[in-house]
Amino acid sequence: MSNSLWGSQFDLPKNDTSKLLNKVKKPKKVKTDEQILNSSTTSLQDKLAIIHKRVREILGVFEPYTRVIRTKEELVEYIQIANKQKVLAVDTETNNSLDPLTCKLMGLCIYTPGQKNVYVPINHSNWLTEKRLEDQLTEQDIAECLALINDDVKIIMHNAKFDKQVIQCTTTYKLRVDWDTEIGAFLLDENELRFGLKHQYRDKIDPTVEKYDITGLFKDVPYAYVDIDVFALYAATDAYETYKLYEYQKKQYELPEHKKLYRLFMEVEMPIVDVVTDMELTGVVIDKERAKRLSSKYRAKLDDCDRRINDELSKYKDKIISWRNSAEAHKKTKSSDKKTKGEQLKDPIELTSTTQLAILLYDILKLPLPDTGKRSTGEEELKKLNLPICDLILEKRGYEKLLGTYIDKIPECVSDVDGRLHCQFKQTGAKTGRFSSKNPNTQNIPSHEISIRMMFATEKGYTMIGSDFSQQEPRILASMAQDENMINAYLDGKDLYAVIASKVYNNAYEDNREFDVNGNMNPEGKHRRTSVKAVLLGILYGRGSDSIAEQLNMTKEEAGKLIDDFFKGFPKLKEWINAQQEFAKQNGYVEDLWGRRRRLPDIQLKPYEVYSKQKRVMFNPLLGTKGELKDNLVDQFEYKLNNSKNYWEYKKILEEIKNKGYDVKNNKGFISQAERQCVNAVIQGSAATMTKKAMIKVHNDERLKELGFKLLIPVHDELIGECPIENKELCKKYLAEDMIEVAKKDVCVPMKCDADDFPCWYYDVYSAEIKEQYKNGTSLEDLVKEHTECTREELEKMIVE
């Protein structure tokens, strides 16, 4: 007992008692379900318990509309109902895997109108024992039931290629698709940011669906371990949402203005799904030995480049030391400001760091900043600086890109299942309708590095067959523009670029060919031909006089004159370009040869948009409403800007506008870009569709099927496939015929396709270069030293072929 503020009958609180009181005062915060799920210390059992609870809380409202089918008899009955309804939406669930070759089909989601959303469990398992649960269907059951779907039933999917591949790889059944709502959405508006099922359903059907989003609950938890009835609440709605999207899209495509777009969807974009599905599953052989040799070759080049960079940096040694000791360097090193933290110049300098490279260029070497005023270290800026160290840095980046993106990356993508590379091709990857690809990006392998493409090969007894559309885009342009000079060049079998050059330079056709009548090189003709080719391709790709001038190493004025002379010789082409731009300004889009639309909303922008920094609001006392007050000054200012006669007058008006509390958005750059895109979108989109039509025809050609030909890779205007060696001549013939045939109806100039066979991709081009080097005096020994990606035997064969 002691006397204290607590009274004489109580002891003072002891130290441990104080701690206890603090705990009572500040109880420990209760973790949320999300925090527990994301904690590395939470057991799988506890995570599953939380998931089961949260799913029922959030999605329990869907329980009356959800059904789990656990027997084959029930599934047969449901499909019979779908046969009567003439439509069935299908979606797959896998064991958290996106690789069709290795994943398990965990469940199937289906929906037909008037019925409940159905989930069919297939491979759910006990989380503790990994043992497959009872009362589920097998993959064989699924295959047999899907085979009962009538031919007149429309099968709907979202991202159908993936679901088709999963079903085919796990059940061996090839399920057709009639409507892919992902592709349907893309054709209706390629400018949308997201084409995933949930985003499309939210944006087009039900904006409240976000409150039911529970995707994050399953992080790091295998779907297979989730209770079947619980998981059904999450998964079964996918097929229903796919069907509702189909209903929405069907109404859109039925509109009169979408007639051509619907035809493109049905005749090209849907049939190509089957082609790409099979092509991806086929895969392509990768020559790993060549990849190793290429890796060694380019790593040696990279090491040599690093050595030369160090030699070049040594020239700046005194400047670097001086800067390190300067107050500026000390300030950057000590600063804790986020913008400057980490700007220390390390020893040696890390040139892969854009920050350190900027210090070297702009602080130490005192080079002038680009026009933007930013300390940029991009490729364009480094080229303009024109310093040996900058050239070496670009060279180093090039080697690192080749190694990291292609040479070392491609062999890593080879599947362990069959030892082949299975690229992924995406129909919604490019807004013009071209395919994009990944794992790896076969559409973007540098054309100047032929040896990288030679990694793509075939198995023993097979050969690659390749065919490309010769001058595909210029031929389409000639047909669409109806330019007689271009059309006649193709009809007469002449070299288009030599014909164009003869018009531009006002001389004879023969004077503009690369070779004269005796087969000798014609340097002047080659130069003129190259110049007009740059102009034509510049028009196709939306490039201006600046870009063309840089490519041809001439002034902007000279490039401008060349472009003007070009259009004088081909006035119909200029008229057609103007017509495309005018159509886009009126409608907000352009349309390619087969109806694909490229929406260019920027072309309809005002050149200048003047706006007040503060909104002016007007109150209506009679109606009790308020709205934004119309500002007449805005119209006046925009009129002045649009009619300014020169740059100085424009600057004066701009100053007046800003002094009165207004601001200006200059949209001229966006408008110009959209105008340039008009031509590119129409021509590139038409070419993309032509290539897809060719792929469909080749894929469905029974002659090629009997010969064992399979498509492997499409690259813009080129199709690559493989076949048994003994069938190569017929395969080349039929492949070229099919490609030419698809354009006959819609293009008024004949397409030309050159088909060839080779042991690996680009072997023919590479072999020709080797032969040319040998012919020009390079010895076999020197060729072996230079081209280490090839064996001596390969090089010997190339020389004598």
Task: Walk through the language-model features, giving the residues of each.
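Conserved "right-hand" nucleotidyltransferase catalytic core of DNA-directed polymerases
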Residues: 2-128, 192, 203-205, 209, ...
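Acidic beta-strand-to-loop metal/phosphate-binding motif
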Residues: 89, 153-160, 464-466
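Short active-site loop/helix that positions an aromatic residue
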Residues: 96-98, 108, 161-173, 185-188, ...
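Nucleic-acid-processing active sites and adjacent nucleic-acid-binding tracks
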Residues: 113-155, 284
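Conserved beta-strand -> loop -> alpha-helix junction used to position metal-binding or nucleic-acid-contacting
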Residues: 173-190, 197-199, 354, 493-497
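Conserved catalytic core of nucleic-acid polymerases
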Residues: 224, 281, 415-418, 422-423, ...
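Active-site palm subdomain of RNA-directed nucleic acid polymerases
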Residues: 254-268, 272, 690-715, 719
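C-terminal structured "cap/appendage" subdomains that terminate the fold
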Residues: 702-757
